[in-house]
Swiss-Prot record:
Native source organism of the sequence: Yersinia enterocolitica serotype O:8 / biotype 1B (strain NCTC 13174 / 8081)
Protein name as it appears in the record: Adenine phosphoribosyltransferase
Oligomeric and partner information: Homodimer.
Alphabetical list of Gene3D superfamilies matching this protein: 3.40.50.2020
One MF term in the entry's GO annotations: adenine phosphoribosyltransferase activity
Reactions performed catalytically: AMP + diphosphate = 5-phospho-alpha-D-ribose 1-diphosphate + adenine
Superkingdom of the organism of origin: Bacteria
GO BP terms in the entry: adenine salvage; AMP salvage; purine ribonucleoside salvage
NCBIfam families reported in the protein's UniProt record: apt, PRK02304.1-1, PRK02304.1-2, PRK02304.1-3, PRK02304.1-5
Length: 187
């Protein structure tokens, strides 16, 4: 990107081009979209934070929730840019205060996420952010945690969406509007 302010289409192309695709990782037949290559490029990283922030500037967001671990890398800077608090959702045993948990399905088995019970107040308008939307299971569990605490969540934002895996439709069924900066076809 140049020193002059790029337009949104240029920023989105730059972001997409900064994400490396690794074939056959973590197993044969998978095309892994590596967001860490975006993080290595300060212009791409800054553009992603800027575009995610712009989308929610006037939406009345009071908290941003990020899912472990790469959701922290995008959620925290967006929260800071919006002037609101950031709340981490983590794997079990990683948060020091009282928590509630929610189980969710994985390809083989189940996993669990936790959130501090005092981190979301009734009526908080919460934006959920993660790096990538695939099947939507992690975000669906995160939304359930927020709603258990009385938070209002209607939006989730991602850097990458893998639309072929159905996560957006799954979240739409839960009343969640999804926004992603870039889409990649295939698994």
């Amino acid at each position: 990107m140049t020193a002059t302010a790029p337009n949104t289409a240029q920023q989105l192309k730059y972001i997409k081009d900064s994400i490396k695709t690794i074939p056959d990782y973590p197993k044969a037949g998978i095309l892994f979209r590596d967001v860490t290559s975006l993080l290595e490029d300060p212009l791409a990283y800054a553009a992603s934070i800027e575009l995610l922030t712009e989308r929610y500037l006037d939406k009345g967001v009071t908290k941003v929730v990020g899912t472990e671990a790469r959701g922290f890398l995008f959620g925290a800077p967006v929260a800071l840019s919006l002037g609101v608090g950031f709340v981490p959702v983590r794997k079990p045993g990683k948060l020091p205060r009282a928590t509630i948990s929610e189980s969710y399905e994985l390809e083989y088995g189940t996993d669990k996420l936790e959130i501090h019970t005092d981190s979301i107040k009734p009526g908080d308008k919460v934006l959920v952010i993660d790096d990538l939307l695939a099947t939507g299971g992690t975000i669906e569990a995160t939304v359930k945690l927020i709603r258990k605490l009385g938070g209002e969540v209607t939006d989730a934002a991602f850097v990458i969406n893998l639309p072929d895996l159905g996560g957006e439709a799954r979240l739409n069924d839960q009343g969640i509007t999804c926004y992603s900066l870039v889409d990649f076809s295939g698994h």
